[in-house]
Curated annotation (Swiss-Prot):
Metabolic or biological pathway, per its Swiss-Prot or TrEMBL entry: Polyol metabolism; glycerol degradation via glycerol kinase pathway; sn-glycerol 3-phosphate from glycerol: step 1/1
Domain of life: Archaea
UniProt keyword annotations, A-Z: ATP-binding, Glycerol metabolism, Kinase, Nucleotide-binding, Transferase
A GO term, aspect molecular function: ATP binding
Residues that bind glycerol: R82, E83, Y132, D239, Q240
CDD domains, A to Z: FGGY_EcGK_like (cd07786)
Record-stated family: Belongs to the FGGY kinase family.
Reactions this protein catalyses: glycerol + ATP = sn-glycerol 3-phosphate + ADP + H(+)
Residues at which ADP binds: T12, R16, T261, G303, G402, N406
Residues bound to sn-glycerol 3-phosphate: T12, R82, E83, Y132, D239
Protein name: Glycerol kinase
InterPro entries listed in its UniProt record: ATPase_NBD, Carb_kinase_FGGY, Carb_kinase_FGGY_CS, FGGY_C, FGGY_N, Glycerol_kin
Gene that encodes the chain: glpK
Length: 493
């Protein structure tokens, strides 16, 4: 009987399930969107039940489309939007909406904590104190949901990022992996354990926390009533770490960029924990008793800016239209768009930056905004890569995610970076990374060498822009960013 791997890829706006075979081919996909909820300006939530329903529906659809039986699934891997914070009881019932990574409700709280504990947090977690991470979200829930702290003290509350919630619903086990734990701001990435001092700073009782395991081991088995089979759930990694693994970026200095709702650039630093003032240090994965680390630059809004063109100001009907519009111009004609809708992430870390379009004239049209949006994605990526280059040598950028289908963007990215940009044959690298981690745990694949041999380039974009143009464009971008920074403080003063 042929055996396959099921990968669950739970994102910020949709839940996907993908069936892979041994050669990394995609046999079946299920994908369902779920809504985001915005109870106040700057607040972003999900209903955890809507996440679960979309994910479970996606699982059933993927199995059906792959024309296989659940008994043919050798293992399940889970990958997820990170930092998003959920609390639930032991029956699996959510006790509040999930607070999404994009949510800014704890920005002021974090500013206070940052003043006193910034260095401690950076040293232990590799993270820059920001409302983006789970710790402040969990503190907010414990402090603001009536009765939650009391229940937590009694051991009646379970906390987790989305991977933990899904694994709990699938297996009844309360676990996470090193990569997801490293994004909570409560986990010591050197000792590989929850940190007592950090728990005290954020007022988190240890009893709510999941057990932390490697990224590739059996965490539990699916409850038989769900799929009619007890399938090992044996891979778990945050979406960006999973993409790094799916890109076969196993060696120090290998870099990938995922173009999704936001852009996330990771550089493998091997067994070395490297620190940068403006980048995050994170656990890439734990595998076979060894831990690999990474430098990460998180850009909060990139693909979401294209969604805004479509759904917010309605100047495009679909994302691919941006390429056609951008190509109508020979240059950006001085128009820049800084999509700082929820502040700016790496390397700026300005919670109070806001979106800005500059350089508009009477002749500015849809094509200028479309081009400026695509160029902004590339500029924001360069901002991060430049920071990384101070610590690790970078020869090329391996790319994945929806926006990599846009050849205009990929060529502009190569031009503005002055580096090769490589798009792989299998675009589903995030889901594939989770599948690889799950498969390795049950000996479906033999090891990293076999996985490396499966990775193939589909297209390589080489830089063709002259140095003077590159320098001029990037200088304009930096000026635009300066004007966007701190804007929320100006208007709130």
């Amino acid at each position: 009987m042929d055996r396959f791997i099921l990968s669950l890829d739970e994102g910020t706006t949709s839940a996907r399930a993908i069936i892979f075979d041994r050669e990394s081919n995609v046999l079946g996909v299920g994908q369902y969107e779920f809504p985001q909820h915005y109870p106040r300006p700057g607040w972003v939530e999900h209903d955890p039940n809507e996440i679960w329903e979309a994910q479970f529906r996606a699982i059933k659809t993927a199995i059906e489309r792959a024309k296989i039986e659940p008994t043919q699934i050798a293992a399940i891997g889970v990958t997820n939007q990170r930092e998003t914070t959920i609390v639930w009881d032991k029956s699996g019932k959510p006790l509040h909406n999930a607070i999404v990574w994009q949510c800014r409700r704890t920005a002021e709280m974090v500013e206070e904590i940052k003043r006193e504990y910034s260095e401690v947090i950076k040293e232990k977690t590799g993270l820059v104190p920001d409302a983006y991470f789970s710790a402040s979200k969990l503190k907010w829930l414990l402090d603001n949901v009536p009765g939650l702290r009391e229940k937590a003290e009694k051991g009646e509350v379970l906390f987790g990022t989305v991977d933990t919630f899904l694994i709990y619903r699938l297996t009844g086990e309360h676990v996470t992996d090193y990569s997801n734990a490293s994004r909570t701001m409560l986990f010591n990435i050197k000792k590989l354990e929850w940190d007592d001092e950090l728990l005290e700073i954020f007022g988190v009782p240890e009893g709510v926390l999941p057990e932390v395991k490697e990224s590739s081991e059996i965490y539990g088995y699916t409850k038989k009533e769900l799929l009619g089979a007890e399938i090992p759930v044996s891979g778990d990694a945050g979406d960006q770490q999973a993409a790094l693994f799916g890109q076969a970026a196993f060696e120090t200095g290998m870099v990938k960029a995922t173009y999704g709702t936001g852009n996330f650039i990771l550089a493998n630093t091997g067994k070395t924990v490297r620190y940068s003032d403006n980048l995050l240090t994170t656990v890439a994965w734990g595998l076979n008793g060894k831990v690999s680390y990474a430098l990460e630059g998180s850009v909060f809004i990139t693909g979401a800016a294209v969604q805004w063109l479509r759904d917010g100001i309605k100047i495009i009907k679909s994302a691919p239209e941006t390429e056609e519009l951008a190509r109508k111009l020979q240059s950006n004609e001085g128009v820049y768009f800084v999509p700082a809708f929820v502040g700016l992430g790496a390397p700026y870390w300005d919670q109070f930056a806001r979106g800005l379009i500059i350089g508009i004239t009477r002749g500015t049209g849809r094509e200028h905004l479309a081009r400026a949006t695509l160029e902004a994605i590339a500029y924001l990526t360069r901002d991060v890569v430049e920071e990384m280059e101070r610590l690790v040598g970078i020869k090329e950028l391996r790319v994945d995610g929806g926006a990599t289908a846009n050849d205009f963007l990929m060529q502009f990215q190569a031009d503005i970076l002055n580096r090769r940009v490589v798009r792989p044959v299998v675009k589903e690298t995030t889901a594939l990374g989770a599948a690889y981690l799950a498969g390795l745990a049950v000996d479906y694949w033999e090891g990293l060498e076999e996985i490396k041999s499966l990775w193939k380039a589909e297209k390589v974009f080489g830089p063709v822009m002259d140095e003077e143009t590159r320098r001029k464009l990037y200088r304009g971008w930096k000026e635009a960013v300066k004007r966007a920074m701190g804007w929320a403080k100006v208007v709130d003063a």
